[in-house]
């Protein structure tokens, strides 16, 4: 299986601009990418990063500490292939689907809660000529596996519903993958809560995920007000 | 397994008051309860409703059309036992845990996306003397299975983290159940989006869930603005 991780290298995570500066958003996006790449390699697959611009995984990714169950041929993070395609997400992903000669998995780079277990379930899902989708909040397509040669993505709007419809049109059986972890993408300040709550369960070694660690370094902590949990940032 | 569904019968879903009147909130809460009870009965378990006040399931629940895989002894919705306990949620649930002589599952009544498959996975999770929790957004405890005799709940705040800590204190192994469907409780207007997106996959018969149908009857439809999906209400 060809596992592709699209990554917006240039202006990542603009919806977090209320709480994070541009360099902080870049650092957080890199930490999430590193967590996602680690989780994928721990399933035994070698991911390909589909980046909007050239990217050094060795120096900017902080994913040099790959899991011990690294797939053959992957010695360090710098061995993870990076494909540069500066087109919008949908066009870049469809180029990957068109060129593919094997099943393709597309895993978003901001699935900071992704675990090897959740990804393994995803990769094993879907019929031999079908499509499997892990939906996100608001009808997003957070991760999918494409085994039908004619399936193409369109990430605009409620893409999960559009992808269901498209799959039905081309006769591709569609399976919905039920995962809270894959369903949680980090786009908005409220999503940071999930990283801090679940970050310690995400890392394979029982430690904390890179994303959670980075958030704490930036001063974020959980805060409970009126029975509801939010994040607060200490800028001292 | 004793499956308990706590239900706030009197003033349900106050956080939806921006978009729904009190009688509409009551109707929506009843539809969600009916969907949850149907999904539980389809797993072969007889749920008990733990209600804050007396409740007629036959006339107010719209769950008279039980699934065909109804457990033995459950002929109609009016056979679903209702226990009335007007104490706050935590106290009422802990009374159930204290009295239990078998494993107890607590499933919130607003898990409108719950499917028999997701619930079956939950019910089968957790060690013989442990606890299994399906967390919700913001660290909530949306559903759990308790097999350790000393485990007690506390639903205030980030209850998922508190429950993890409590389980560790009493030596109960804790398993986190990874489910988008069980992780989605319907509390706020933004959650209604999920009901409309996934409602058609939720009903066992391939139709639409009662909750989604009720929302459409109330005039709610999905709306895509700037690539993001919200609900809009047509009050005409």
UniProtKB/Swiss-Prot annotation, chains A, B:
GO terms of molecular function: GTP binding; phospholactate guanylyltransferase activity
SUPFAM superfamilies linked: Nucleotide-diphospho-sugar transferases (SSF53448)
Keywords assigned: GTP-binding, Nucleotide-binding, Nucleotidyltransferase, Transferase
Pathway: Cofactor biosynthesis; coenzyme F420 biosynthesis
Highest taxon listed in the record's lineage: Archaea
EC number assigned by the record: 2.7.7.68
Catalytic activity field: (2S)-2-phospholactate + GTP + H(+) = (2S)-lactyl-2-diphospho-5'-guanosine + diphosphate
Class of this enzyme: transferase
Keyword Transferase: yes
GO BP annotations, alphabetical order: F420-0 metabolic process
Pfam families documented for this protein: CofC
Described purpose of this protein according to its UniProt entry: Guanylyltransferase that catalyzes the activation of (2S)-2-phospholactate (2-PL) as (2S)-lactyl-2-diphospho-5'-guanosine, via the condensation of 2-PL with GTP. It is involved in the biosynthesis of coenzyme F420, a hydride carrier cofactor.
Subunit structure comment from the entry: Homodimer.
UniProt similarity note: Belongs to the CofC family.
HAMAP family, per database record: CofC
Classification via NCBIfam families: F420_cofC
Name of the molecule in the record: 2-phospho-L-lactate guanylyltransferase
Gene that produces this protein: cofC
């Amino acid at each position: 299986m060809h596992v592709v991780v699209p990554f917006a290298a240039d202006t990542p995570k603009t919806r977090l601009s209320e709480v994070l500066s541009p360099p902080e958003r870049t650092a957080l996006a890199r930490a999430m990418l590193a967590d996602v790449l680690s989780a994928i390699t721990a399933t035994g697959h070698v991911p390909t990063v589909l980046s909007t611009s050239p990217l050094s995984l060795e120096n900017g990714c902080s994913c040099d500490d790959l899991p011990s169950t690294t797939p053959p041929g992957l010695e360090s993070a710098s061995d993870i292939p990076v494909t540069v395609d500066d087109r919008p997400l949908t066009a870049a992903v469809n180029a990957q689907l068109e060129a593919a000669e094997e099943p393709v998995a597309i895993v978003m780079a901001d699935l900071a809660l992704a675990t090897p277990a959740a990804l393994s379930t995803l990769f094993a899902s879907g019929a031999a000529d079908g499509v499997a989708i892990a939906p996100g909040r608001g009808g997003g397509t957070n991760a999918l596996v494409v085994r039908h040669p004619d399936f193409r993505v369109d990430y605009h709007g409620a893409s999960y519903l559009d992808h269901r419809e498209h799959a039905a049109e081309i006769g591709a059986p569609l399976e919905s993958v039920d995962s809270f972890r894959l369903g949680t993408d980090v786009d908005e300040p409220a999503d940071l809560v999930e990283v801090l709550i679940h970050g310690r369960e995400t890392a394979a070694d029982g430690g904390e995920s890179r994303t959670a660690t980075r958030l704490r370094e930036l001063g974020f902590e959980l805060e409970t007000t009126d029975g509801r949990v939010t994040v607060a940032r200490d800028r001292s």
